[in-house]
From Swiss-Prot:
The keyword Calcium applies. SUPFAM superfamilies: Annexin (SSF47874). Residues 1-140 are annotated as: Repeat-rich region. This is Annexin A7. Annexin repeats lie at residues 160-231, 232-303, 315-387, 391-462. Keywords: Acetylation, Annexin, Calcium, Calcium/phospholipid-binding, Repeat. Residues 1-18, 26-38 have a biased composition (Pro residues).
Length: 463
C-alpha cells in the first residue's frame, strides 16, 4: 500500500498493517516476521555472521608470527602522502618499497576528541566519482573498524515501557496541532527494536495504525525521517534497494552504498526480506536494472558470501597484490574478473593488507589503480569496498559530507545514513567527519536543515 499524500518515492506499507484503501505499487507484503524474525540491531558492532561454508581467503593457512589484523599501518601514498588522521595502535610504516618522509600518523583515541590535523588532500592522481569536486577525497587510513569497537549514538532506553511511550505519542497527536517535541523525545531515544514494540502497543491500545497517524500529522523531510526510524532495519535496507530500482532510472549509488558495505548476515536477511515483502528476487532485479561488470559486482555482493575471518594471511595478501597488478597496471587492458573475484570474496582486514602489499610492490595506491583501470559505477563500487576496508566510518562521513555540500541537500542520503548507522558506528562517523572536514557533523546538519527535521536529526546524532 502507499500512504495518502506521500510523493511518488514514498514508503511502501509496513509489514503487518491493514490496507488504507489505496492501491499499492508493490506486490502485497508477505508478512515478514518483524521485529522478532531478525535479531535486533542493537548498538555496537554487527553480530557475527554464521559460517557460510564459503572457502577461506584463497585457502592459504595463516602464517605464524604475524601481528593481528590492524597491526600494520595504512598504505602510504606514493610520491609523498598527506598527513592523514591515524587510527589506534598505528606506528611507523613497515619496510618494503619505502616512502621517504612519510609522517607517522598522530594517535587518535575514540574516547577523546578528534585529532587536530590538516585537511587531507585526497589520493594523488586518483579521480574520485564525479560528485567529488576536483577528484579529491579527504580519506584517512586506519584499521578496518570491524576489528575495533564501534558505537551508535542511539542505545536501547533503560526502563523501557512501550505502552507509556505509545500513550505519549497519542497525546502528542491528539486534538488541534501536534507536539513535535514530544514525538522527537520518544523516537530519538529508543532503539529500532523498541520502536517496533511501541508501534505494536499503539495498535493494541488504540486500534489505530501509528504510522498512519504520524503521516497525517507530519510532512516533507520530517515525515520521511520518522517513517525511516519506524521501519525495521532490514526492511529499510530492502525498501531502499527496491525504491532505487523501481520506475525509470536506477539510483546506482544507493545500490553500492548498501550492498558493498553490509555484512554477510545482513545481506542474506535483506535478500529474504526483499522476496517476502515485495514478491521479487533481488538478484533478478539487479540483473534487469544494471549491466556489464557493474552488474557482476552487485550480483557477487548480494550472495553474502564474503570471507569474514578476521585473521590476515599476509602471504595471500602479497599474492593478491601481484594478481591485481598483473590484471590492471601490469598489462594492456584490464582483467575485470580478477578484481571482482578478489574484492568480492576477501575479508575487509585481508583487503586492507592487500592494499598495503600493493602499495609496497607497485609503488602506487590500489585506489588510484582502480581509478585508472575502471570508470563509472563499477569504479565507484570497487572503490567503496576498498574504502570500507581502509576505514568504514570515513566512507560514511564522506557520503554525509557530500549529501550536504553545495547548493541543495540530498536528504534521502542524509536520512538513510543517519538512520542506518545510528545504532552501529555513528559515534565513529562523527569523529571521522570532524577530522576530515574540520567541522562537526552536527554543525553541518544545523546549517543545512531546518525546523523539526533539524531537531530530530541533531537528536539522533547526539548534538
Amino acid at each position: 500500500m502507499s500512504y495518502p499524500g506521500y510523493p511518488p518515492t514514498g514508503y511502501p506499507p509496513f509489514p503487518g498493517y491493514p490496507p488504507t484503501g489505496q492501491e499499492s505499487s508493490f506486490p502485497p507484503p508477505g508478512q515478514y516476521p518483524y521485529p522478532s524474525g531478525f535479531p535486533p540491531m542493537g548498538g555496537g558492532a554487527y553480530p557475527p555472521a554464521p559460517s557460510s561454508g564459503y572457502p577461506g581467503a584463497g585457502g592459504y593457512p595463516a602464517p605464524g608470527g604475524y601481528p593481528a589484523p590492524g597491526g600494520y599501518p595504512g598504505a602510504p601514498q606514493p610520491g609523498g602522502a598527506p598527513s592523514y588522521p591515524g587510527g589506534q595502535g598505528f606506528g611507523a610504516p613497515p619496510g618494503g618499497a619505502g616512502f621517504p618522509g612519510y609522517p607517522q600518523p598522530p594517535t587518535q583515541s575514540y574516547g577523546g576528541g578528534p585529532a587536530q590535523v590538516p585537511l587531507p588532500g585526497g589520493f594523488p592522481g586518483g579521480a574520485m566519482p564525479s560528485q567529488y569536486p576536483g577528484g579529491q577525497s579527504p580519506y584517512p587510513s586506519q584499521p578496518a573498524p570491524m576489528t575495533q569497537g564501534t558505537h551508535g549514538t542511539i542505545r536501547p532506553a533503560a526502563n523501557f515501557d512501550a505502552m507509556r511511550d505509545a500513550e505519549v505519542l497519542r497525546k502528542a497527536m491528539k486534538g488541534f496541532g501536534t507536539d513535535e517535541q514530544a514525538i522527537i523525545d520518544v523516537v530519538a531515544n529508543r532503539s529500532n527494536d523498541q520502536r517496533q514494540k511501541i508501534k505494536a502497543a499503539f495498535k493494541t491500545m488504540y486500534g489505530k495504525d501509528l504510522i498512519k497517524d504520524l503521516k497525517s500529522e507530519l510532512s516533507g523531510n520530517m515525515e520521511e525521517l520518522i517513517l525511516a526510524l519506524f521501519m525495521p532495519s532490514t526492511y529499510y535496507d530492502a525498501w531502499s534497494l527496491r525504491n532505487a530500482m523501481k520506475g525509470a532510472g536506477t539510483q546506482e549509488r544507493v545500490l553500492i552504498e548498501i550492498l558493498c558495505t553490509r555484512t554477510n548476515q545482513e545481506i542474506r536477511e535483506i535478500v529474504r526480506c526483499y522476496q517476502s515483502e515485495f514478491g521479487r528476487d533481488l538478484e533478478k532485479d539487479i540483473r534487469s536494472d544494471t549491466s556489464g561488470h557493474f552488474e557482476r559486482l552487485l550480483v557477487s555482493m548480494c550472495q553474502g558470501n564474503r570471507d569474514e575471518n578476521q585473521n590476515v594471511n599476509h602471504q595471500l595478501a602479497q599474492e593478491d597484490a601481484q594478481r591485481l597488478y598483473q590484471a590492471g597496471e601490469g598489462r594492456l587492458g584490464t582483467d575485470e574478473s580478477c578484481f571482482n573475484m578478489i574484492l568480492a570474496t576477501r575479508s575487509f582486514p585481508q583487503l586492507k593488507a592487500t592494499m598495503e602489499a600493493y602499495s609496497r610492490m607497485a609503488n602506487r595506491d590500489l585506489l588510484n589503480s582502480v581509478s585508472r583501470e575502471f570508470s563509472g559505477n563499477v569504479e565507484s563500487g570497487l572503490k567503496t569496498i576498498l574504502q570500507c576496508a581502509l576505514n568504514r566510518p570515513a566512507f560514511f562521513a564522506e557520503r554525509l559530507y557530500y549529501s550536504m555540500k553545495g547548493a541543495g541537500t540530498d536528504d534521502s542520503t542524509l536520512v538513510r545514513i543517519v538512520v542506518t548507522r545510528s545504532e552501529i558506528d555513528l559515534v565513529q562517523i562523527k569523529q571521522m567527519f570532524s577530522q576530515m572536514y574540520q567541522k562537526t557533523l552536527g554543525t553541518m546538519i544545523a546549517s543545512d536543515t531546518s525546523g523539526d527535521y533539524r531537531k530530530l536529526l541533531l537528536a539522533i546524532v547526539g548534538q
